[in-house]
Amino acid sequence: MGENRKTLGELGFAAHVNVAVTGVTIDNRLVKRGDLFAALPGTNVHGARFAMDAIAAGAAAILTDPDGAAVLKSDLDPDFPIVVTSDVRAALSRAAALFFGTQPETMVAVTGTNGKTSVASFCRQIWNELELSAISIGTTGVEGDWTYPLHHTTPDPITLHSILAQAAQSGVTHGAMEASSHGLDQRRLEGVALKAAGFTNFTQDHLDYHHSFEDYFAAKSRLFEKLLPMDATAVINTDDPKLSIYASDLAMLGYTLITIGTNAANDLYISDQRFDATGQTLRFSFKGKTYVKRLNLIGGFQAENVLMAAALVIASGSDPQHVFDTLEHLTTVRGRMQYAATRKNGASVFVDYAHTPDAVETAISAFRPHVMGRLIAIIGAGGDRDTTKRPLMGRAAVETADHVIVTDDNPRTEDPASIRAMVMAGATDAANITEVGDRAEAILRAVHMLEPGDGLLITGKGHETGQIVGQDILPFDDVEQASVAVAALDGMI
């Protein structure tokens, strides 16, 4: 592929000098000659402070906001191309989309506190079963017919639009992506042409960033009110009371909706679920027609994730019957109610990414119908993150599991014992809770407790393969550790 070259006008900007740029970057250390350097406001310092370094490295133009322009006023040559806009993050995202120029023709996005990764993965899997080339983008990276590792659930807009362009150029026609509240608030999804968007649920998380439920919901709702075209479809899970109201609001605004849930008033609703040790059988209806399908997935909540994905795929143009026929072939996302090991006595171990109070309660409650005996849960909370959810996680766990072990998650720069104490504080009156700091030891102890018919759910880290302690990432995989513990205790090693 030849050099990509676009004028500022072609990127949607009006500048006093309509120069051409050959790249877009937000990092002055990565500037190449001919780049557009986007000087964004930061938490501690404005990116405009580094604009002169970017120019010295060869930047052909600067994109910034009024505050950035004020920083540059005394240093910048008045003839140098500069674009000043009030919402610089949104402008950057749209410019990145225009610069890279293409994306899979069918894109959907899903937001919500929990379930985003599973829904995006299920969309991709359904499309693949329908013999369509597809990817999913989110917490577990870019997966499917074109792959790429990611460091954020919703990547920065330059990375995102580069990924979408490369995927499209490789033949990918369909894409499903997670839309995190951070990504939405920071305008990273602007420029993605959506056919449909889904809202799974809304509970407490990320209040360290958004500060209030109102701000958190406003970030989530941006996906529909700002990014979703009016001719596209919103898929809303109305089992969540707040989302039931929100669905009505969107309908009044003129949006096309597919509502899902367990209420027969929904377009797509679950009427019955039967659980067994390896999955569930689902009875559901869509617009007057009833279906019975097998899901080889653990956890009742996965049924709603599957139907959310099915609705998004239907909303983006696929035949409902063909979509529903694929459901028995779906597999779980790494780290989402993922099978880890089985003891010789038949007791099973699963791993889940649940790391919020609601997710912990949901995961344990969903695992319960698959367990004949005691349900043991391991929980922990991450350091340098929302502290208010820690005692709530402890309370949620002791109220839903038969025994709980509190251990370290990713303590980061916090004192691990202090984090555990905050989790334990939510269950001070409970007798079914134990504290074991070392995560490997906690898993070993929990596996040792398992009797015939019992089940162990290890929550918090899911697909992660490292534990963040201080500034270091130490190798640690919950699935691998559970397998090792079972093998050791059952005399297989």
What feature does the model see in each segment?
Residues 1-94, 98, 241, 269-274, ...:
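N-terminal leader/targeting and accessory segments in enzymes
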Residues 60, 195, 402:
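Receiver (REC) domain switch/active-site residues of two-component response regulators
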Residues 40-45, 333, 360-361, 365-428, ...:
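Active-site beta-alpha connecting loops in nucleotide-dependent enzymes
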Residues 42-44, 68, 181-182, 204-205, ...:
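Short glycine-rich anion-binding loops that position phosphate/pyrophosphate groups of nucleotides
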Residues 55, 70-76, 170, 185, ...:
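Acidic, Mg2+-coordinating active-site environments of NTP-dependent enzymes
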Residues 82-87, 434-437, 442:
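Short acidic-hydrophobic, aromatic-tinged amphipathic segments that line or gate anion-handling sites
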Residues 207, 474-493:
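Short, flexible loop segments at boundaries between secondary-structure elements
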